[in-house]
């Protein structure tokens, strides 16, 4: 073990630090110098009130910077004053290809050096390279098949249709009409038990796809002729990830090899300090920006869902303005804020998510009313297929599906929800993370598949650094995500703590704050939410299913009560105490109003719980525009007090309610 024990030199002093929750208290901070050895990882687990900041320092002998990354997101070298902050009980690991020296401000309750090489440099990289080859093949199909381009261009995706169900193999006519296997990038599903590291693997694969040296466009690039003309002249590249020439048509295979091996460029510290130059990126046209445009599909509506628990989302990524997903806080499971908030603009320190798609499940367990869960999946798959018909960059880059954790009860249904999602999203690769039985069962299931589209099953070991989390932590994360939606993020450290700590460590340090040290976690600003009182009848609030119904004896003679797991019921809090109690302290999803119900029975009574202005199925597939929190009710005045992220008119007066409760304390 002596060869991997790192020399950590630290100094400790008392400063006033604002914790990640913004309470402000005296904490004991330390400034440590850590040498991170090649292919190993330094594990950090923060507890409540703890925050750390990390930056590169040059080698004292050579003066060169090393390389390091967190779940595939690089810490940019060559900028000593750039700090990366982490808080909100984050659990993460720093790893390095060739070794690096980093400075750590603050201390965690748990931090240690792993005694085995990071999986980043074994199966994770091999998996990425296989996906890279699949993306290049998809791009070549789109580039060389004019008939495919013509088919996609002629497809009409403007018309809104009702997607069919994927209950059986080959079902789902609407989605199948839009789906074409040609030109499709890899569609990868990550499955495994809870706390196995599924989201971490998703972030790693997404980061390496975003940092790829490939050009994700059908044409060769607007700069192709210019670069070819001046190929013999010295040229300054914006980073190692674009150092190859993607526009040489003389030898496609050589170009593929260059792109596949481009990941090796990430390992060289001398190249890392040129990585992702903002000035160079600004000069490049859109078609010449390197990196794939993958889409993360978050199908776990529990803690860590996007943007809040109770949602499932498709998050299209772009390698701009930077090409990585950070991990500053578990409240931002993929390091980004989606535009569904209606208040948080894309951060300049992360990639952008272009027109994300979020749908409301209203629950944190997909097994609860699974028929409803599957129908929401139908709608999400339908929206994704429509997107991929016209967004060819995302099409060739593929899908990365983050699935709910597998539990013992799933085996009794032969992992029915997994099979359903495989059909709906046309999955071609299932990565089983750390679950031997699940790997064997899925292998047996798809060995007998006669559809001709059975996915490939890939088993990978669970990382030794995967952290088991308990129900208390999950509830904290649940509350933190909802709170950060309305209130944003505080800085991990106060300005006073930042200046004091730097000054106490170095007499020559000016009384200014180095870049990133006082940055809000995830670059999400602190918000001032708006509490307002609105008429009770301003919002049309619906829920799926009905907990309590009138007995049959209370119905008209001859009438029967027909209930469905997917029946949408309009709330009536004035006349129903159950609806009133359900509404108080709930988080409501404001959704895009679907087309009006033209086929409803004109003779039906407005008092009928099933009577409303929209088709049930249309409401299940309505896109989320934002959220409000019901903080108080006044039934005498028929008023609701709601909390909104910003003042002004609500984006919609059509709302869906689930079992998502939160108290603003």
UniProtKB/Swiss-Prot annotation:
Subcellular location: Nucleus
Record's keyword annotation contains Ion transport: no
A GO cellular-component term linked to this record: mRNA cleavage factor complex
Gene3D superfamilies, sorted: Clp1, DNA binding domain, P-loop containing nucleotide triphosphate hydrolases, Pre-mRNA cleavage complex subunit Clp1, C-terminal domain
InterPro entries named in the record: Clp1, Clp1/Grc3, Clp1_C, Clp1_C_sf, Clp1_N, Clp1_N_sf, CLP1_P, P-loop_NTPase
SS bonds (residue pairs): none
Ligand binding (ATP): 91, 195-200
Species of provenance: Malassezia globosa (strain ATCC MYA-4612 / CBS 7966)
Keywords on record: ATP-binding, mRNA processing, Nucleotide-binding, Nucleus
Alphabetical list of SUPFAM superfamilies matching this protein: P-loop containing nucleoside triphosphate hydrolases
Region: Disordered, residue numbers: 218-283, 593-615
Regions of compositional bias (Basic and acidic residues) in chain numbering: 219-238, 598-614
Role played: Required for endonucleolytic cleavage during polyadenylation-dependent pre-mRNA 3'-end formation.
Gene responsible for this protein: CLP1
Subunit relationships: Component of a pre-mRNA cleavage factor complex. Interacts directly with PCF11.
Any single GO BP term: tRNA splicing, via endonucleolytic cleavage and ligation
Assigned protein family: Belongs to the Clp1 family. Clp1 subfamily.
Primary site of residence: nucleus
GO MF assignments: ATP binding; polynucleotide 5'-hydroxyl-kinase activity
Protein name: mRNA cleavage and polyadenylation factor CLP1
